[in-house]
Every structure is written in structure tokens, then in C-alpha cells.
């Protein structure tokens, strides 16, 4: 067994204090002093894994013992725990040597918003123990982080374990989804837990975060306002509901008389924002999510608080209606990783649903009937415009173009179905489950993406793109799929390369461009290959 622990502490902020400024640290299990059984370092051979809110696995060891691990984070402390049980399955007494494990790493104070941080690993027990046949010995490894000058808190492993069990048990038992498909049921259960355990107590209040190793202590118009927030009232999670209300409060801070877009993301515990992708249709996302949340939450006081934000976002979208009657935007939630044109299906569909929600919510709040009638009229108009502007036959299916110039099927043709627009439901469902979009891993974002992904994966693995902001894989796919082939640099074969810089391969890409002008991380190079015998197959290989 090779074990490596990757730790992220969202509330220990690093410099620069941006979207990705959570303290992160990786510890290889081999860096820790080994436990010994009968004088020999333990080597584990895992044979069973289980994930049910805790990652559990069982291993056999070379001496015939069995070892059980339960790994879990603390519910409310910057702590991660590896709870270990050693079972003597032999017919003889064994000796266990638990060394004094005290791994410490202190960060440079210049790199921390709050100064230096200390990351530590300790063992709950140490010393020599005798274990009789069928007896169990238990100890824990405790991974923690804190301000370097802060007092190290006492951690009760049993208490942390019970808090985690309680969270998992309640979340699993609330809003149970049952279908004939057990895998789908498990997906939904994991999604519930993923939602409730990703909420952080920040200086800007409770914030639900997308996570993914990079996105914490911040909110997004899509991940929070559109996705998670409308779900929390159905689950009934107290922290989830508060984080949703808090996120809408943060977005409402940016309401303005000039109708400039609300930022896509409010980051760094609420003290900064990110809007580098322009208007992604964020106001449609916020209006959609706030309306649905308010109706599901069922509290008039909260609904009244959210109403100005909903009303402002709807007016913003109305002002973005183009000559064809659909909502224009700079991009969509994929932020240019895939093309979205000047107006996309997702944004207009969300706007339609937000208008429907607002007309219903406004009626409950006794809002001006003339305004609510306008919302109903605008909803009918945008629904008709969606059919006229986006409705199309794509790859033989009566479905939608994701944007006007779109020639490939896209997964988000499903969005109209989620907002009760069923005019093209049959063709859309057939397209979603077609060979163009459906893969063994689920829906591809765009037709044929899966095949392209496989072809460029080695390139991705050999290229260091950690500096690129966003989903690097989809970003590269987009670049590969949509070069401007009309440009001479791509289309001509008799190019003059006399002024091209020669580089020696093999070599790491970052070494090739030292001292050059900054780039977006992508460089093109060309090689002309003459093939005389076209009856044979050839393979072109770039070797490192």
C-alpha cells in the first residue's frame, strides 16, 4: 500500500489571497516513522475498500495480522484523522511498536495572510504493546494545521469520529432518493454529503464551496446560486440554508444603477471578486437560483430580502435581450473552454425559469400585479424565442443548437427539459443517449469530445499547466478542437521557417521558453512528413 495524504486548509489563507489561496500540503506516508509488528516495519496489502462518509479499508500484513483504517476529516476543526485498528488474526501473541510520530512543517510567514502556519502529524499512542490472538489494538494518526504561534488544541479522536458519524447518518437519512438503480441512489447520497460537508465558516459568513482541490472560501453564480442553493431547502440542512442566504447577500452587494454585471465569483472569504470571464449569464443563474431557493425555503422574511436581487437580475437579463429575442452574454459557465457564441441556450433557459419563479413568488409577496404580468409575458416571449432561435435538427435529432453557429451536439441541450420546456423532449433525449454524446462515463460536454480526449491525454500528462486558471483539460480540448484553420499559420504547407527558432528535443517545455514573452501556456510547432508508400500504416512518435 502506498499512501499519500493531500491536505487543504481553506481558512489558512496564503498570499496572494485569491481564488486558490488555501493552504495545501502533501505528506507521503513513507515520510512518517513506521509502526513495527514483531520488530519488522508493517507492509500492508489492502483487499477491501468502502466509502460511506468515511473512507475505510482493510489490509493484510506479512505477519498474518489484519489492519483496518478509517479516514475522515473533522466536522469543525482543521484536522484529518486516520483511525487504525490492528487485529491479531494469528494463534500467537504479537508485539507492536508504535513510535513517537511528530511530523512538523512550518510555512514561511511571508506567504501567509496570517503569518506562518504549522502543519503537524502526531500519533495518539506510542510505546510497546503485546497483542493476544483475536485481540484488537487501536491508535490514530492526527493531521492538523494552525497558526504557528497558536496553542495546539487537544483532539479527541472518539469525539471527532462520533461527530462525523452523526453528520453522515443524518445526511444519508434525510431526503432519501430511491430508484431501481442502486448506483444512481449512491450517486445522490454522495452528492448530499458532498454538499453539506463543503461549507466553511469564513470572515464573510458561512460559504459553500465547489472544492475540487482549488476552490474554497468563495462563492460562484453557477456552483452556489444555481446548483447548490436551491437544493438545500429540500435537504433541510441548517448550515446549507444559511450558506445559501449568505451567498445571495454577497451577490446583492454588487447591485448597481448602471446594470454592470455582478461578478461571477466572490472570493477570499468575501473580500475580493473574480470576473475575468465577463458576463457568463451569471444574472440568469442568480435569478434562477434565488427564486427557486426562496420558494422552497418557504420563509417570507427571507423571500422579501432576496426579492430586490431577483428583480435586478431579471431586469439585467431583459436589457441583454438581442434582436432575436434571446439573452446575449460574453460566455457561459464553461468560460470559453467550449464555444458559446453571442447567446447560448443555457442562459436563456435559466432566464425563462427565473421569470416563472418570480411571477409565482411575487404573487405570494403581494408584489405589483402589473410587474408580475410583465414577467409572465416575458416568459412566454423568451420561451417562443428559444424555440425559434435555438431549435434545430442536429445530427438527425430534433433538438437544439447550443448557440447559433454550433455544429456539434452539446450536453446542455438538456437544460430546457429541466425548466419544463418539452417542445423537443423526444429528440433531445434521443440525442443525449446517442453515440455522439453518451460515453461509458456519462455525457460528454460536446459530441466526439471523448475520442479527442483520449488522443491528447498523453500531451496533457507531459505538459505542466498548473499555472492556467480553470479546468486545464477542457481548456486544451477547446484549443485543439477550434483552431482557426483559415489562418496561414495553420493551413499553408509551403511556409518559410527560416526565421523560426530551433529548439533541441527532448526537453521540458518550460525550459524551451525561458526568457520569452509570457504566453497562455500553449505553443504550436510543426513538422512536415513525406510519406511515399500510402499502402502502409505509419506511427509518428515524439519520445522524451
Where are these regions (language model features)?
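Active-site core of glycosidic bond-cleaving carbohydrate-active enzymes
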Residues: 220-249, 304, 308-311, 315, ...
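Aromatic-lined ligand-binding clefts that engage carbohydrates, nucleic acids, or primary amines
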Residues: 500, 521, 529-544
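Short, hydrophobic/aromatic beta-strand segments
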Residues: 91-100, 351, 536-541
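Short amphipathic alpha-helical coiled-coil/interface segments
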Residues: 188, 192-195, 372-390
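Acidic/polar, glycine-enriched structural segments that form the non-catalytic walls/loops
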Residues: 50, 62-218, 300-302, 363-364, ...
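An extended acidic
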Residues: 1-60, 133, 165-176, 180, ...
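Short beta-strands within extracellular/lumenal beta-sheet-rich domains
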Residues: 65-67, 517-532
Amino acid at each position: 500500500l502506498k499512501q499519500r495524504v493531500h491536505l487543504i486548509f481553506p481558512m489558512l489563507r496564503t498570499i496572494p489571497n485569491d481564488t486558490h489561496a488555501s493552504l495545501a500540503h502533501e505528506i507521503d506516508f513513507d515520510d512518517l516513522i513506521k509502526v513495527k509488528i514483531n520488530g519488522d516495519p508493517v507492509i500492508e496489502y489492502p483487499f477491501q475498500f468502502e466509502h460511506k462518509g468515511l473512507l475505510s479499508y482493510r489490509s493484510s500484513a506479512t505477519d498474518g495480522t489484519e489492519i483496518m483504517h478509517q479516514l475522515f476529516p473533522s466536522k469543525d476543526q482543521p484536522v484529518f484523522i486516520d483511525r487504525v485498528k490492528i487485529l491479531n488474526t494469528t494463534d500467537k501473541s504479537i508485539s507492536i511498536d508504535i513510535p513517537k510520530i511528530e511530523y512538523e512543517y512550518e510555512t514561511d510567514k511571508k506567504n501567509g495572510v496570517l503569518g506562518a502556519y504549522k502543519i503537524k502529524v502526531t500519533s495518539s499512542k506510542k510505546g510497546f504493546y503485546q497483542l493476544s490472538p483475536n485481540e484488537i489494538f487501536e491508535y490514530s494518526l492526527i493531521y492538523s494545521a494552525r497558526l504557528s504561534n497558536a496553542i495546539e488544541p487537544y483532539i479527541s479522536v472518539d469525539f471527532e469520529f462520533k461527530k462525523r458519524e452523526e453528520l453522515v447518518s443524518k445526511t444519508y437519512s434525510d431526503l432519501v432518493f430511491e430508484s431501481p438503480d442502486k448506483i444512481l441512489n449512491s450517486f445522490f447520497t454522495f452528492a448530499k454529503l458532498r454538499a453539506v460537508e463543503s461549507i466553511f465558516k469564513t470572515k464573510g459568513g458561512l460559504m459553500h464551496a465547489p472544492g475540487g482541490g482549488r476552490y474554497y472560501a468563495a462563492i460562484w453564480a453557477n456552483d452556489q446560486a444555481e446548483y447548490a442553493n436551491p437544493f438545500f431547502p429540500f435537504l433541510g440542512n441548517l448550515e446549507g440554508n444559511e450558506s445559501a442566504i449568505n451567498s445571495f447577500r454577497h451577490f446583492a452587494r454588487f447591485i448597481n444603477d448602471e446594470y454592470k454585471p455582478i461578478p461571477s465569483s466572490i472570493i477570499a472569504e468575501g473580500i475580493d471578486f473574480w470576473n475575468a470571464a465577463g458576463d457568463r449569464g451569471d444574472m440568469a443563474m442568480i435569478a434562477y437560483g434565488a427564486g427557486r431557493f426562496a420558494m422552497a425555503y418557504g420563509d417570507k422574511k427571507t423571500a422579501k430580502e432576496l426579492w430586490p436581487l431577483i428583480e435586478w437580475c431579471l431586469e439585467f437579463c431583459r436589457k441583454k435581450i438581442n434582436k432575436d429575442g434571446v439573452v446575449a452574454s460574453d460566455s457561459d459557465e464553461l468560460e470559453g473552454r467550449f464555444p458559446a457564441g453571442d447567446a447560448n441556450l443555457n442562459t436563456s433557459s435559466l432566464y425563462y425559469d427565473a421569470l416563472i419563479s418570480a411571477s409565482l413568488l411575487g404573487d405570494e409577496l403581494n408584489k405589483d400585479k402589473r410587474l408580475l404580468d410583465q414577467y409572465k409575458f416575458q416568459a412566454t416571449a423568451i420561451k417562443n424565442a428559444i424555440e425559434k432561435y435555438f431549435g434545430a435538427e442536429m445530427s438527425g435529432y430534433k433538438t437544439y443548437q447550443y448557440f447559433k453557429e454550433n455544429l456539434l451536439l452539446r450536453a446542455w441541450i438538456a437544460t430546457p427539459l429541466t425548466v419544463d420546456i418539452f417542445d423537443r423532449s423526444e429528440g433531445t433525449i434521443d440525442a443525449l443517449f446517442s453515440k455522439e454524446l453518451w460515453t461509458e462515463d456519462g455525457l460528454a460536454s460536446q459530441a466526439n469530445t471523448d475520442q479527442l480526449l483520449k488522443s491528447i491525454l498523453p500531451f496533457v500528462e507531459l505538459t505542466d499547466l498548473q499555472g492556467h486558471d480553470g479546468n486545464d483539460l477542457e481548456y486544451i480540448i477547446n484549443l485543439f478542437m477550434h483552431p482557426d484553420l483559415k489562418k496561414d499559420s495553420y493551413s499553408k504547407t509551403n511556409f518559410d521557417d527560416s526565421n523560426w527558432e530551433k529548439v533541441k528535443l527532448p526537453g521540458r517545455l518550460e525550459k524551451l521558453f525561458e526568457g520569452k514573452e509570457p504566453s497562455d501556456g500553449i505553443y504550436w510547432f510543426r513538422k512536415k512528413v513525406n510519406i511515399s508508400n500510402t499502402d502502409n500504416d505509419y506511427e509518428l512518435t515524439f519520445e522524451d
